[in-house]
Amino acid sequence: MLTDIVILAAGQGTRMHSALPKVLQPLGGKPMLAHVLATATDLAVRRIHIVVGFGGDAVQAAFPDTQASWWIQAQQLGTGDALKSALPGLTGADRVLVLYGDVPLLTAATLREFLQQTPVTALGLTTASVSEPHGYGRILRDADGQVQGIREHKDCQTDEQAICEINLGMMVLPVQPLAGWLQGLSARNAQGEIYLTDVVAAARADGYVVWPFTLADATEALGVNDPVQLAILERVFQRQQLRALQMQGLRVADPARVDIRGELTCGQDCWVDPNVLFVGEVHLGHRVRVGAGAVLQDARIGDDVEILPYSHIEGAQIGAGARIGPFARIRPGTEIGEAAHIGNYVEVKAAKIGAGSKANHLSYLGDAEIGTGVNVGAGTITCNYDGANKHRTIIGNDVFIGSDSQLVAPVNIGDGATIGAGSTITKEVPPGGLTLSRSPQRTIPHWQRPRRDKK
């Protein structure tokens, strides 16, 4: 049995009020279509097809590495016409699973069960019984309970609007008769569109069995038509992500106030406070604590690390036992060594900080290599930029740098050196000694402060 998948992604999404095509609207940090495409790929079918229309170039550009085939719906004439656009690619397939680019929560397990339960020669459709069916197509059954067709909401008669069994959209269709069914569809309906759902009546007329598949969890089939629905799906998606991590041992103070926009993996006994954001690929080792308001992006965090509130870590590695923040910013290319401390209002960029070193207050450490056991005093700046190029600062082991020092790169500071507070260092500092660069202190006795002129 050869199965293809067609993802319908041609809609403009006018109710989104956005220049971005609807299927590119982000969910969990990725376009909605990316979630659908990943699920389709997990099913390992013969071939995946994507039908685009509005903003088709932008949609294709967002997925340069996909192996899916692209098809263009030239005019927005409805879902039936959209599927017709992909018919040439279905040659050789026995059946086709139709998915939607704006229904991103479906799981591969659910779709695999749908495919397995639908008989080979049947038309399969997905249904659910809900208390509020407004806006959904209704499932029409005969006196024997057999599915006769689907009536879109805007075309329902008064008695049909009371039906609570709804069509969720996903279908399995036999390929051999499909072209004829689609060719016979018309746009004589309330929306003036060619409905894919009308193939159900066509299949019945040709003697095909219509096989309804009821989803155990109808939230998987939630779609997006406007920003309100997108926000609802975002919360559902985040709850799903966090629930899975909690079941693996992650402790979260308030799951409703933590967002994952990428992939988060955790060791044992990790703790996450409210309003934390994880972006990209983030790994937490064992016993990591993440304080309120922190942002972690594409970061690897070692065991026993404490990240204090409102710290931002991006593209960095944090060694075991380190302490970050509060209000610290760790920028890309940074490696923080074991048991190192980066404190409040310290910014570190493209720097390597050795084990046990500390920069606890109000410093900028950029393009630097700092050894082990170094103390960086408050207000220390590595002056790495000359207006045209970046230069590196090299600091050895067991160095003490006094407060309010400027290290003008390129510069090397030897092991065990001490830099006096308030120094501007422009030359190499030898190991072991005390280096100062200050104007001599002097006092002007009986000095008078300036006074304002009287008017």
UniProtKB/Swiss-Prot annotation:
Subcellular location(s) per record: Cytoplasm
GO annotation, cellular component aspect: cytoplasm; membrane
Region (Disordered): 420-455
Top-level class of the enzyme under EC nomenclature: transferase
Region (Pyrophosphorylase): 1-227
Pfam families: Hexapep, NTP_transf_3
Annotated stretches, region: Linker: 228-248
Positions with a binding annotation for Mg(2+): 102, 225
Active-site residues, record numbering mapped to chain: 361
Domain of life: Bacteria
Binding site for UDP-N-acetyl-alpha-D-glucosamine: 8-11, 22, 73, 78-79, 100-102, 137, 152, 167, 225, 331, 349, 364, 375
Sequence segments annotated as region (N-acetyltransferase): 249-455
Keyword Magnesium included in the entry's annotation: yes
UniProt catalytic activity: alpha-D-glucosamine 1-phosphate + acetyl-CoA = N-acetyl-alpha-D-glucosamine 1-phosphate + CoA + H(+); N-acetyl-alpha-D-glucosamine 1-phosphate + UTP + H(+) = UDP-N-acetyl-alpha-D-glucosamine + diphosphate
CDD domains: GT2_GlmU_N_bac, LbH_GlmU_C
Keyword terms, alphabetized: Acyltransferase, Cell shape, Cell wall biogenesis/degradation, Cytoplasm, Magnesium, Metal-binding, Multifunctional enzyme, Nucleotidyltransferase, Peptidoglycan synthesis, Repeat, Transferase
Keyword GTP-binding on entry: no
Names of the cofactor(s): Mg(2+)
Purpose: Catalyzes the last two sequential reactions in the de novo biosynthetic pathway for UDP-N-acetylglucosamine (UDP-GlcNAc). The C-terminal domain catalyzes the transfer of acetyl group from acetyl coenzyme A to glucosamine-1-phosphate (GlcN-1-P) to produce N-acetylglucosamine-1-phosphate (GlcNAc-1-P), which is converted into UDP-GlcNAc by the transfer of uridine 5-monophosphate (from uridine 5-triphosphate), a reaction catalyzed by the N-terminal domain.
Entry protein name: Bifunctional protein GlmU
Organism (species): Acidithiobacillus ferrooxidans (strain ATCC 23270 / DSM 14882 / CIP 104768 / NCIMB 8455) (Ferrobacillus ferrooxidans (strain ATCC 23270))
